[in-house]
Amino acid sequence: MLPLLASMIVSFIPGSQAKAIRNVTLGASGLSAILSLVAFCTFQVDGGLQFETKWIWVESLGLNFHLGADGINIGIIFMGAVVAFASVCCAGDITHRVKEFYVLLNIMIGGVLGAFASMDLFFFYFFHELALVPTFIMIGVWGRGQNRNYAAYKITLYLSLGALLALIGLIGVYVQADADSFSIPDLINKVKEQSIDESAQKWIFPLLMFGFGILVSLWPFHTWAPLGYSAAPTATAMLHAGVLKKFGLYGMIRIAIPMAPVGAQYWLGILAWLAMANLLFCGLVAVRQKDLNLLIGNSSVAHMGFIFLGIASMNIIGLTGAVLVMIAHGLLAALAFGLSGHFYQQNSSLDMTQMGGLLRKMPLAGTAFLMAMMAGCGLPGFANFAGELTIFFAAWSAGYKLITVIACLLYTSPSPRDRG
């Protein structure tokens, strides 16, 4: 919660003191990254829910401010804190209305980390919405290009629709479970003891699947992502593509499948084919791009297909691979968009036809971008390779043999689909 505290501190600093504003934000995000590293290194694999913070908020409604970490979210929280710190480091290109930008950036970071750490259904959703609102404003006010307002409106429309569908699904879970608390662990335990009616699960799960899916850019609801990222400030693109986008995937793993397993079995076959569409169509669109940000954005959307396929397998191998690719892609997307922002500052253009000779002009940045491309291609030695290979095995064992064959062909094809 340090970034939210930093946003309040920054709001009291005069706007003329840009250096102090940046230092406060950098300090808060840096300390958050250090604390998340300590938590990650001291996490006990068999220890269940750890690092808990729980305050009773509205006892009559069963609302509690409940944070914690387990095997599902500890790696995502650590990745999110690292990406948040990196995004602050890359926000030096903001030169006007600096105070307002950093207030919103701190709120976005706090919302992102809070959403993944929340163990209460209400705060899980609240923190995500808290992070989304600054995204729209930052693209519209500090974005790049003539289409930034259109991009801001489009991302607002799509993500609001996704959030609304997810909210209806979450309310459905709460009502059908006849719960007296919003605690996610308690809800899961209650559903295990007395499962939600199967007919109810068959309409609750698609609401969650498509609601969370839109937030992740599931095909065909994906067109907001490349446009939004190409227009967004560097820090915003890094944070959203790297971390906030994983909220929907995390929601499916944490909530949708455990609370509506029968509905999941009914709908996950459809999700697997939509995942294939992410890989195929978005990969082909990425190959056609000349703008570096559009390439990275479409490539990022294509990567989501692997994660959706891992989730659709509905087995421990696939879910483990999905979480691993979520973490790897978060770091990869943040690195790619951060370097893209650096290239834009140096060249005032992201036209790839004019960007030859990067290694000669900028050896460090060029080498880092080369590593990002290699990781995006899933070469052995990078986390993407291990995660995606695991997902292939899981999808095959789950019966998605044709989809797995097609995915493997796309994975090994000599196209530059995964430069980002």
Language-model features, listed with the residues they occupy:
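Active-site-proximal acidic secondary-structure segment that organizes catalysis
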Residues: 133
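Transmembrane helix-loop-helix hairpins at membrane boundaries of multipass inner-membrane proteins
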Residues: 9-103, 180-193
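A short, hydrophobic C-terminal helix/tail in secreted or cell-surface proteins
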Residues: 414-420
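Generic start-of-chain signal for non-secretory N-termini
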Residues: 1-8
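Hydrophobic transmembrane alpha-helices and their helix-loop junctions in integral membrane proteins
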Residues: 86-92, 110-122, 136-413
